[in-house]
A protein has these predicted regions:
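Generic structural hydrophobic/aromatic packing signal, biased to beta-strands
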Residues: 27-29, 43, 76, 111, ...
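Basic/Trp-rich segment in TM-proximal cytosolic loops or flexible interdomain/linker regions
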Residues: 64, 131-135, 141-337
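Short, Lys/Arg-enriched, Gly/Pro-containing loop segments at transmembrane-helix junctions
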Residues: 13, 250-254, 294-297, 362-370
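Internal catalytic domains of large membrane-associated glycosyltransferases
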Residues: 1-160
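C-terminal amphipathic alpha-helical interaction region
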Residues: 300, 308-484
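Short acidic (Asp/Glu) and glycine-rich catalytic loops that position anionic groups and cofactors
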Residues: 86-90, 119-124, 219, 301-302, ...
Length: 484
């Protein structure tokens, strides 16, 4: 991917594994997060280094040769991939139809169906990637993944898919379905807490009853649910922390004390972020089921921070819900309101949390305090040093976007050769594009995408431009050069 880095050593090791095991079709590495300066990004980076190794080892233990492909930082055996992993266009409309958005899980399942294994090289170092710099950027990516994972339900009964990958398809859906289930659970629990106060228990529902019917409460079940939930959430973090200390690697995280404090703070932030993600995931799932389409556009990779305006636009509903929900519970059932306070506080603070954790200044503050440090910051590898030098160079000049494919013969020919479909010739769009050379705003996004996905229209547009009278073409070409 554009945000991926792999060392030469891990490429050589993975290639050797592929050569020694001809039945391995895909070998996936376990990338560590790098390059983030925002507080949110630094928290995610820290988590991948502390919890990532034990998580990846656990995945490899259970999946063995039925692992997942994550779409990047992997080595693929090309011939079986080309022969067996072509993605179908699903019939019908999104979310269950159309082009498959989350392609990697499907390609791994198709590779296994063809008899080749998919493995996770969890114990090899030297694989890196950038994570989203802000909470909203991560949620934007999650929305695309949500629709893509829903499409996997169409492939669940596909002939030849092994049970392990059928389960992974369901698990991918439950990543977002669990958020909706959690919301329903706390909503129904809140409703029950209100009814317990508003409705007096009836001890004798029938006349002339000899014995009363007492309200039943099962504290053992509640305690058991609380313990199981706590273990599932926090035991992996404790095991990851123990593993770092046991291997005497705490110095690479700023020392044992700073490491433990960072884990505690990461846990606190996770508790605050989880309800916000729950609300967004619930909305994503419902919107996808209602047929709202999403695309796969470019991702924001820079640590520029989030504006208060954008945060307010996306989080105001969470804040209002948190205030309204909390006020009702506090008035009617204060004890339950206190019990639910971690979730309600997260809703109320969602705007502030999203903005503050997106700021590089907040990330640098924690870095100066020695918190959320990672081994690549304490002892950077040669690849990270080279990457830092390259990123320190002035950026390349920006080029005009889609118009480059209109004018430039080389770009036009290359772009058309890379398109796998012929595309439809739409005269009205082509005519509008010819008039849009002078005004980029004249073309809508859908029209631009139609042009860029149609080799026939790109050829006709390019041909018309180059066959136009010399004076007109020179004028247009001069204007084009001024854009560079």
């Amino acid at each position: 991917d554009a945000d991926s880095v792999m060392s030469g050593d891990i490429l050589v090791q993975m290639t050797a594994i592929m050569e020694a095991n001809p039945r391995v079709g895909i070998l996936q590495s376990a990338p560590k997060a790098i390059g983030r300066h925002s507080l949110y990004g630094r928290i995610q980076q820290f988590a991948t280094y502390v919890y990532g190794p034990i998580f990846a080892a656990g995945l490899s233990f259970w999946q063995l040769g039925d692992a997942q492909y994550w779409g990047h930082n992997a080595i693929i055996r090309i011939k079986p991939f080309m022969e067996n992993c072509a993605l179908p266009v699903l019939p019908g409309d999104p979310p269950f139809g159309g082009e498959i958005l989350s392609h990697d899980f499907v390609e791994a399942a198709l590779m296994r169906r063809a008899g080749y294994e998919v493995w996770l090289s969890y114990d090899l170092d030297g694989s890196f990637e950038e994570t989203p710099p802000t909470l909203l950027e991560e949620l934007s990516r999650d929305r695309r993944w949500c629709q893509g994972n829903l499409q996997h339900l169409r492939l669940f009964l596909l002939k030849g898919i092994i049970p392990a990958h059928r389960f992974l398809f369901l698990n991918g859906v439950m990543i977002y379905g669990s958020g909706l289930l959690w919301f329903c659970f706390i909503f129904m629990s809140s409703l029950q807490a209100l009814l317990d106060v508003w409705i007096e228990p009836v001890y004798f529902p029938t006349e002339y009853a000899l014995f009363p019917e007492w309200p039943v409460w099962y504290p053992g079940w509640a305690i058991f649910l609380f313990i199981v939930t706590t273990v599932l959430l926090f035991l992996p973090k404790l095991l990851g922390l123990y593993l770092v200390i046991a291997k005497k690697r705490a110095d690479l995280f700023g020392g044992a004390g700073k490491l433990v404090l960072s884990v505690l703070l990461e846990t606190l932030f996770s508790v605050l972020f989880a309800p916000i993600k729950m609300m967004f995931h619930s909305k994503f799932l419902l919107l996808a089921l209602l047929g709202q389409k999403v695309g796969w556009g470019p991702q924001e990779r820079s640590d520029v921070g989030l504006s208060w305006k954008d945060a307010l636009r996306f989080h105001w509903r969470d804040t209002v819900i948190g205030l309204f929900w909390g006020a009702i519970l506090w008035i009617v059932n204060p004890a339950f309101c206190i019990w639910l306070s971690p979730i309600l506080i997260s809703f109320v603070l969602s705007i502030f949390l999203s903005v503050w954790t997106s700021r590089p200044t907040a990330g640098e503050l924690f870095k100066r305090l020695g918190l959320f440090l990672t081994p690549q910051e304490m002892d950077p590898s040669p690849e990270m040093k080279i990457l830092a030098e390259v990123l320190a160079n002035p950026p390349l000049p920006a080029y005009p976007d889609f118009k480059l494919a209109f004018f430039d013969p080389w770009v036009n020919a290359l772009h058309r050769s890379l398109l796998c479909k012929r595309g439809r010739l739409m005269p009205e769009v082509l005519k509008k594009a010819l008039n849009a050379i002078d005004s980029k705003e004249a073309l809508s996004k859908s029209e631009i995408m139609a042009l860029l996905h149609s080799p026939a229209m790109l050829f006709e547009l390019h041909k018309c431009l180059w066959e136009s009278p010399k004076e007109q073409f020179v004028e247009k070409w001069s204007r084009y050069l001024s854009w560079i």
